[in-house]
Amino acid sequence: MTIKIAVIGFGNIAKAIITPLLEKNLISPEDIYCLVNSKESLENIKKNFKYNVNIFQADSKESNLIWDCQVKLLSVKPQQLKEISELDNHKKNENLLVSILAGVSLDKLIQKFPNHRCVRVVTNIPITVGKGLTGISWGEDISEDQKQFTKKLFKNSSKIYEFTEDYLDTFLALTSSGPAIIALIIEALSDGGLSGGLQKKLSEELVMEMILGTITLIKQNNISTTDLRNMVTSPGGTTISALRVLENKNLRSALIESIVSASNRSKEFR
């Protein structure tokens, strides 16, 4: 049986999820039904998205077609949830609804879409380059086929982890807020190189290559971060001098607290 997918909100993350499936012919463009909020968005997608998917404005008559799709990928802004739920035709069909809305709990999804089987997903911005991390929490009565199809949506653009919902907030803090934290660290280290006389562009390149090389070394040699730190830290040397400054400035504690704070903030959005 052909499965039709409704994509409700067609931003960068939704495109990153759908595009690999189209590229690998795992789904056909005619089986994708996209719902957008404005004529501008509709025209932009028609002009710039290379696949000829079905696309409708939310206020058009044709938009009702999305509610008959077996799978809905919900990727609007969280504040649009009420508006979208009011468009639902409320047919009892037990179709699959996969939400990537930040901070919207399974309970709220089930409340807004009682005739669907709901799944809450957290993913992150590197999914747009095929390097995402995706956490999945299953709602009630999800069939095995629906679980497998949900994983199919994400496995071509990200690594998948399954959690009970209690852990999704921490997963979100680490993986979704994490890229901004890493970007800040890259900026700060690059500014350190700038202070030492390096050109900004070169300093940024060196920092990013250093981080990539460090991660590769840890993963390929299967060593711990402590092992690596000890490998490059000599008595009285430059590295221990740098680490001493960071410990005195409580960098470790600040990073831990940043994740705890982001996780707590995610819980407040539920």
What does each of the following model-derived ranges do?
Residues 108-117, 133-171, 181-220, 265:
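Internal alpha-helical scaffold of NAD(P)-dependent oxidoreductase catalytic cores
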Residues 32, 42, 199-207, 228, ...:
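Small-residue helix-packing motif on alpha-helices
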Residues 21:
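Aromatic pocket-lining residues of Rossmann-like dinucleotide-binding sites
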Residues 10-11:
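Glycine-rich Rossmann-fold phosphate-binding loop(s) that bind the pyrophosphate
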